[in-house]
Swiss-Prot record:
Lineage: Bacteria, Pseudomonadati, Chlamydiota, Chlamydiia, Chlamydiales
Assembly mode: Monomer.
EC annotation from Swiss-Prot or TrEMBL: 6.1.1.16
Principal subcellular localisation of the protein: cytoplasm
Protein's name in the database: Cysteine--tRNA ligase
Cellular component, GO annotation: cytosol
Subcellular location: Cytoplasm
Length: 474
């Protein structure tokens, strides 16, 4: 899709700390996003990141780019091993239900599928090969605990993504944990030596002994195997900047000698009661929790899009209810468009102008670092303008179809608009509608009101128009 008045896409690059014009090195665009660690159900804070990444990919496609998208599935790391060992079951048996639940949640939130979902356990040989190369280069070493570590002192550019100055920090002890804070940059683990008490029966054989790969190495190898040595975009949550993405850069560039990714995009935290939503804090909600409260995936997706991805978003039930109301307004608008039946061969000039101006405003918002909240503002301005045109009585079926097509275009990015309002109306309700219409024709207003109340009690609203009654669910 071409936009004559838009210079190009601008993204905020974490590495440079500024907005940059997007100019990919590859066709299709190589996009890698960090996926779930399948030790539990993903919470809606995780899904804020996944929805942001979905908007990123949809925006690229909207602007005419083809994209190859890889999202990893982390099925072996500290937490999955601990979970499987605690239940005394094989690793795959432990992770498989959470993997399946993740894909179900993606569908519920209308998140477009990636092209590849590599599982870490499927790439162990490639990871062993990479560690062997790093050992041969002298960039990695075997510690006293028999684990293999990456030496930060052998990679001078370490810290360039998270903007760390190693000379001013305590460095470089060794750390075998997958996650740690940026005040303590350490030689990180590439291969974690097997510990029977900790790991049970979960290990792989390697030239450097039994064990399993470190979490950071897993993403590097899966990305490079499927997308090549250099990516166009690497995205994730702000939690991933350090140490995960910093370590990915170090080991990947040490292996290839090439820049690992050109653009780094990171989404901010989802808050609950003003605090970061986190499993470690115990203040998290899963998508399933919200579905059990009778919210919909559409409402949750809408809520997760209500602030710019680089701004923290505070979750409240009131905010989710407000999203339900906004979606109802949009649904009523679509229903009104579908109900237009005035004949017309072509859309009005004002309809064409309004649609063109809306698409331009929406596209400018996206091009400005995925400013979806501004895009929504332009959408509701557009809805108000078209409702005014309909009120004037000159809006034809051709106009309504053109507007519906415009909404479909923007929804290829948003993925949240209620673009169909058709529902199955029970025959009993339609019979009541017919009886009410007959009562109105005979001016039996008391009977018409009684039948209207029965229709309402059945969960439907009847609206009278020049072309006859229209029925829609409450």
């Amino acid at each position: 899709m071409a936009f004559s008045h838009i210079e190009g896409l601008y993204f905020y690059n974490t590495a440079s700390q500024k907005k940059e014009l997007f100019f990919p090195n590859h066709t299709p665009v190589r996009l890698y996003t960090c996926g779930p660690t399948v030790y539990d159900y993903a919470h809606i804070g995780n899904f804020r990141t996944y929805v942001f990444e979905d908007i990123l990919k949809r925006t690229l496609v909207f602007f005419g780019y083809s994209v190859t998208h890889v999202m990893n599935i982390t099925d072996v790391e500290d937490k999955t091993i601990a979970g499987a060992s605690k239940k005394n079951i094989p690793l795959q048996e432990y992770t498989q239900p959470y993997t399946e639940a993740f894909f179900e949640d993606l569908d519920t939130l209308n998140i477009a599928r990636a092209d590849f979902y590599p599982h870490a356990t499927h790439y162990i040989p490639q990871m062993i090969q990479a560690i062997t190369k790093l050992l041969e280069q002298g960039i990695a070493y075997i510690g006293q605990d028999a684990s293999v570590y990456f030496s930060l002192n052998r990679f001078p550019n370490y810290g360039k993504l998270s903007h760390l100055d190693l000379s001013s920090l305590r460095c470089c002890s060794r750390i075998s944990a997958d996650e740690y804070d940026k005040e303590n940059p350490s030689d990180f683990v590439l291969w974690k030596a097997y510990n029977p008490e900790r790991d049970g029966v979960i290990y792989w054989e390697s030239p450097f002994g039994k064990g399993r790969p470190g979490w950071h190495l897993e993403c590097s190898i899966m990305a490079m195997e499927l997308l090549g040595d250099s990516l166009d975009i690497h995205a994730g949550g702000v939690d991933n900047i350090f140490p995960h993405h910093e370590n990915e850069i170090a080991q990947s560039e040490a292996l290839s000698g090439k820049p690992f990714a050109r653009y780094w995009l990171h989404s901010e935290h989802l808050l609950i009661d003003g605090k970061k939503m986190s499993k470690s804090l115990g203040n998290f909600l899963t998508l399933r929790d919200l579905l059990h409260q009778e919210f919909t995936g559409q409402e949750v997706r809408y809520m997760l899009l209500q602030s710019h991805y680089r701004t923290q978003l505070n979750f409240t039930e009131e905010a989710l209810l407000a999203c339900r109301h906004a979606l109802r307004r949009l649904k009523d608008f679509v229903s009104r468009l579908e109900g237009v039946d005035l004949p017309g061969e072509s859309p009005l000039p004002r309809t064409l102008d309004s649609s063109s101006q809306f698409i331009e405003a929406f596209s400018r918002a996206l091009a400005n670092d995925l400013n979806v909240s501004t895009g929504f503002a332009s959408l509701f301005d557009f809805v108000h303008e078209i409702n005014t045109l309909i009120d004037q009585g000159h809006f034809s079926k051709a106009d309504s179809l053109y507007i519906l097509d415009t909404l479909k275009k923007v929804d290829t990015v948003l993925g949240v608009l209620p673009l169909t309002t058709s529902v199955c109306i029970p025959e009993t309700v339609m019979q009541l509608v017919a009886e009410r219409e007959e009562a109105r024709k005979t001016k039996n207003w008391a009977m018409a009101d009684t039948l209207r109340d029965e229709i309402l009690a059945a969960g439907f609203l009847v609206e009278d128009s020049k072309s006859g009654p229209k029925v829609k669910p409450l």
